[in-house]
Amino acid sequence: MSDHTIPEYLQPALAQLEKARAAHLENARLMDETVTAIERAEQEKNALAQADGNDADDWRTAFRAAGGVLSDELKQRHIERVARRELVQEYDNLAVVLNFERERLKGACDSTATAYRKAHHHLLSLYAEHELEHALNETCEALVRAMHLSILVQENPLANTTGHQGYVAPEKAVMQQVKSSLEQKIKQMQISLTGEPVLRLTGLSAATLPHMDYEVAGTPAQRKVWQDKIDQQGAELKARGLLS
């Protein structure tokens, strides 16, 4: 994310943004891996359950046809059936642990997403304030001159008579004219990121990273509820021997 065209005064804020981005992307990576593991475990479990169901009837038929005599083949098939059922149970246990991890990561993603949004807002606030101050100090001389001239002209008694109905103070009239013009220009303004090194790097929106909006721990109140839930679930899984 580093860019040497970024002004020096923004470098500390940019470093903080990069750190926050890296932290969130790490949680997002772990979330993707966990979701993939959940899906894979479900597929493997279903395949085992299907195989066990198909083999059960065949095994039972063969067992009865043999008059209840367990041949080596029937014994081996029975061992395989038991192993499949045990594996199905292990996949069920794995799914419980992985779903717990997914819920834990939702809170972690919310936390790092909040940190990233704050860092993003801080950097853009510094940039916008600097740009506005620069524009006011360096590029408004022609506008200020024209405003001052207009005020001087309107202060002439021939332009505006005190006490006349509808009288507007020259300063107020000129400011209103400028305000209306600026508001219209602001509405028409389109910022192109192509010519904006800072905005091209950061984007105008912070909501561009994956896994940013689970809304389970985005606020202190939400986080407390989420943490209590995670603590309780973790304790239950440890009691069942599924977590160390």
Swiss-Prot record:
Keywords: Late protein. It comes from the Viruses. Although P4 acquires its capsid proteins from helper phages such as P2, it possesses the ability to assemble capsids that are only one-third the size of the helper's capsid. The sid protein is responsible for the assembly of P4-sized shells. It forms a P4-specific scaffold with icosahedral symmetry on the outside of the procapsid-like particles. This is Glycoprotein 3. It comes from Enterobacteria phage P4 (Bacteriophage P4). The gene is sid.
